[in-house]
């Protein structure tokens, strides 16, 4: 990370911090940073606890006239968002529960996609399943050209399909043929390939990811 960005982080004002989920909102010079750093876990996963926190953060960003845009970043060293909490999925015992879970994710990401202020997904590491669905709902996606950065919808390997809008947003982003290949195989897409196919807008070195995303 560059020295300039280190100074920016030190002078950021923390507006909100949820200790239970590890999600925080800070702002510097009109740019908000939404950081996800799930406690006691090597990766960030998505569960029913994070949705209400993201909703609060979206509302705060919408209402704060000093904020012009937002970055979505991970506090994990080599992982962005690794998808749904598998243990929570295993506790779903009925079609109605599964539908409610899916609809909740759809509503959250529809709101993210409709935000009047741009959200930039600053991706370093794995953006998998629901993590990629979140990235697709952001207006821009910037990723690091690094071996740890992979994007995929691996749910199919568990007998599932993306339930939070990924099956609609991915074809609009990369085209139907490429989207079907990802959705039906669950294959990992490396950073360079993701850029070539239009899945991300820009590739950068990890040390300047936040600088570029904040511009």
List where the protein language model places each region.
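Hydrophobic/aromatic ligand-binding patch that stacks against planar heteroaromatic rings
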Residues: 111, 134, 169-170, 181, ...
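Glycine- (often His-adjacent) and acidic-residue-rich active-site loop
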Residues: 74-108, 127, 157-160
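Amphipathic alpha-helical segments at domain termini/boundaries
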Residues: 6-37, 136, 177, 184-215
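Hydrophobic, secondary-structure "cap" segments at the distal end of domains
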Residues: 167-177
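Hydrophobic/aromatic residues within transmembrane alpha-helices
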Residues: 72-73, 85, 135, 194
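Conserved CoA-thioester-binding segment of acyl-CoA-metabolizing enzymes
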Residues: 2-73, 107-111
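Glycine-rich beta-to-alpha active-site loop
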Residues: 75, 106, 111-158, 162
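Short, histidine-centered active-site or binding-site loop motifs used for metal coordination
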Residues: 36-40, 93, 155
């Amino acid at each position: 990370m560059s020295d300039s960005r280190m100074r920016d982080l030190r002078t950021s004002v923390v507006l909100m911090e949820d200790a239970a989920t590890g999600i925080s909102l800070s702002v510097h010079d009109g740019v908000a940073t939404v950081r996800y750093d799930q406690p006691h876990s090597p990766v960030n996963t998505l569960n029913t606890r994070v949705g209400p926190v993201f909703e609060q953060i979206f509302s705060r960003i919408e209402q704060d006239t000093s904020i012009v845009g937002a970055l979505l970043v991970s506090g994990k060293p080599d992982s962005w968002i690794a998808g749904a909490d598998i243990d929570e999925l295993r506790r779903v015992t009925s079609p109605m529960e599964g539908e409610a879970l899916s609809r909740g994710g759809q509503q959250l990401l529809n709101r993210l996609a409709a935000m009047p202020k741009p959200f930039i997904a600053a991706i370093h590491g794995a953006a998998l399943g629901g993590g990629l669905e979140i990235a697709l709902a952001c207006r821009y996606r910037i990723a690091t050209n690094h071996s740890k950065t992979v994007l995929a919808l691996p749910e199919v390997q568990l007998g599932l399909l993306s339930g939070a809008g990924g099956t609609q947003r991915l074809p609009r982003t990369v085209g139907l043929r490429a989207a079907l290949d990802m959705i039906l195989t669950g294959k990992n897409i490396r950073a360079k390939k993701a850029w070539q196919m239009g899945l991300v807008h820009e590739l950068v070195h990890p040390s300047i990811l936040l600088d570029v995303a904040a511009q």
